[in-house]
Amino acid sequence: MPRFAEQQLYIGGQYVAASSGQTFDSINPATGEVLAKVQRASQADVDRAVASAAEGQKVWAAMTAMQRSRILRRAVDILRERNDELAELETLDTGKPLSETRYVDIVTGADVLEYYAGLIPAIEGEQIPLRESSFVYTRREPLGVVAGIGAWNYPIQIALWKSAPALAAGNAMIFKPSEVTSLTALKLAEIYTEAGLPAGVFNVLTGSGREVGQWLTEHPGIEKVSFTGGTVTGKKVMASASSSSLKEVTMELGGKSPLIVFEDADLDRAADIAVMANFYSSGQVCTNGTRVFVPRMLQARFEAKVLERVKRIRLGDPLDDATNFGPLVSYAHMESVLGYIEKGRSEGARLLIGGTRVSDGDYAKGAYVAPTVFTDCRDDMTIVREEIFGPVMSILIYDSEEEVIRRANDTDYGLAAGVVTRDLNRAHRVIHKLEAGICWINTWGESPAEMPVGGYKQSGVGRENGLVTLGHYTRIKSVQVELGGYSSVF
């Protein structure tokens, strides 16, 4: 019997039954336990949610900036009060350790909501003088109803990253979480309602991307789609959104990010960064630095330091506070990652550690894969070219700065990049040549609310977080005012 009651859709400020009559299972990837039956939205439910959002958006947009700001700040307070219970639910649903969800997922999501709540009164237009008798002013107006489509690795954080700027700008949002991890997005909807958000301004539709996601991207009542997920799916979403009604899109997609260690680097720091950039969240982070470039002269020393740290990783029950490495999100994803590991072996990469499923005792019930490090990798290997989205580090050896920059950029992706060096002149010089939207110097992975997040090339379109993102959720109206006479040519 499932641990939780059957999960309904959230439309118009309340839970409602899906008209499809169908459900799917939410599975705990650490144990195989069915957490809940989750209702599958139908196309009629999408229509119902869009209609509810359109009505709610009118009420929301008519409120003053300070009224909207206070409601979102109240939601921030509730999120922080319920941090621990939300973190436990996120851990059950994703398999991520409590040591992570308790201090990152809800905390950073609430930070983003607080950031945008504070910016609401600053959404303003311009006044442009033309001549003594005439001027132009601009208004930043909300788009209306927008859709957010989330990924399974950071469910509530992504829901907050997408909804915070959208709601701050006066829009309503219909959010579709990944069918793999749907539970905390529904809790977020409850919190928004409790905080005073008008009915319909934040709706949650659960179901598959192939169905619900596509219906949202095609719906004529939706003005924008913000999607987080894989590049292949992102291309489909973008094509559907543009062909249906020229919707605006924001895409945060895949990555195969380079981490470059230079010969003057503090090797202990470099190894710490490399391990964090590959094994945090069991490697299921889009910005992970999975291509680790190391100077030939440092290869043996660097590998030894990485191995020392990987052996300290505490794989275990994600509900145990001592655990810092949990299972992958699902059995299907585990099989995908194991397939890539086998590819690495068959294509000639040298395995330093890991490379197997962990199936001793109770671990056999879960989707556990050991932290894996390959070295002597080549740029043409599958594990180097394709996004694995799992705990697999590829070490590549280089001989010159010019060479490593060229090879680091030799990818279809451009989400993130980083360098480790004591020479800040070199750090900035190299970073400015790397084709990536998010870059780190002597660190990795932090994405504060103030920092725009997004990729180059096939890693995305537009940005999330930061001041710039508010512009993605408004449209500019230009108004000319003439105070003097008017002369017709006719």
Curated annotation (Swiss-Prot):
Catalytic activity entry: betaine aldehyde + NAD(+) + H2O = glycine betaine + NADH + 2 H(+)
Pathway stated in the Swiss-Prot or TrEMBL entry: Amine and polyamine biosynthesis; betaine biosynthesis via choline pathway; betaine from betaine aldehyde: step 1/1
Amino-acid positions noted as binding K(+) 2 in the UniProt annotation, renumbered to this chain: L246, K457, G460
Pfam families, sorted: Aldedh
Keywords attached to this entry: Metal-binding, NAD, NADP, Oxidation, Oxidoreductase, Potassium
GO biological process terms, semicolon-separated: glycine betaine biosynthetic process from choline
Annotated binding of NAD(+), by residue: G150, A151, W152, K176, P177, S178, E179, G230, T231, V232, T233, G254, C286, E387
Active site residues according to the UniProt entry: K162 (charge relay system), E252 (proton acceptor), C286 (nucleophile), E464 (charge relay system)
Cofactor: K(+)
Superkingdom of the source species: Bacteria
UniProt-annotated binding residues for K(+) 1: S26, I27, D93, V180
Cysteine sulfenic acid (-SOH) modified-residue sites: C286
Cofactor binding summary note: Binds 2 potassium ions per subunit.
EC assignment: 1.2.1.8
Entry-linked InterPro entries: Ald_DH/histidinol_DH (IPR016161), Ald_DH_C (IPR016163), Ald_DH_CS_CYS (IPR016160), Ald_DH_CS_GLU (IPR029510), Ald_DH_N (IPR016162), Aldehyde_DH_dom (IPR015590), BADH (IPR011264)
Marked site (Seems to be a necessary countercharge to the potassium cations) residue numbers: E248
The protein's enzyme class: oxidoreductase
The protein's assembly and partners: Dimer of dimers.
HAMAP family: BADH
Function as written in the Swiss-Prot or TrEMBL entry: Involved in the biosynthesis of the osmoprotectant glycine betaine. Catalyzes the irreversible oxidation of betaine aldehyde to the corresponding acid.
Record-stated family: Belongs to the aldehyde dehydrogenase family.
Protein name per the record: Betaine aldehyde dehydrogenase
Organism annotation: Ectopseudomonas mendocina (strain ymp) (Pseudomonas mendocina)
Originating gene: betB
